């Protein structure tokens, strides 16, 4: 990358997917979406696992979007995407500008060279905060941050780990009776 942009501010804290997409769409508009641009998003976040932000950004920018992109080919302003499905894939074509939510198989990361690592320290990183974005109609104190989030998490926890399974070996009647007795004892059957 030649430059970076950090979107950050206290006003953005506590945002759910709706509010996050408002903020990111405003930031993308601030940077500028050109006719031949492609906005790349991940498939989903690991914290909420909702897979909503990318699609919501595309809606707010009024650009086409394709989800679950596994392979992308660009020819001028035509974008051809192999989209993964549960039981196969489909190939879709769209025009730029567009937004793609990508699965990890789309890219094989490469290791940075030492020179590349050193170069990254000289690349500019600008910050877009609330004051930089507040003139955008998407940035309204009632639609961003905790106040603007229609969903709230009241409790988050890691469920207790279940114990190791019990292994039964054998293919005789006694093994089957032992299995049936265990299942009855646990009220499974």
Protein language model features and the residues they cover:
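N-terminal glycine-rich FAD/FM-binding segment characteristic of electron-transfer flavoproteins
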Residues: 1-189
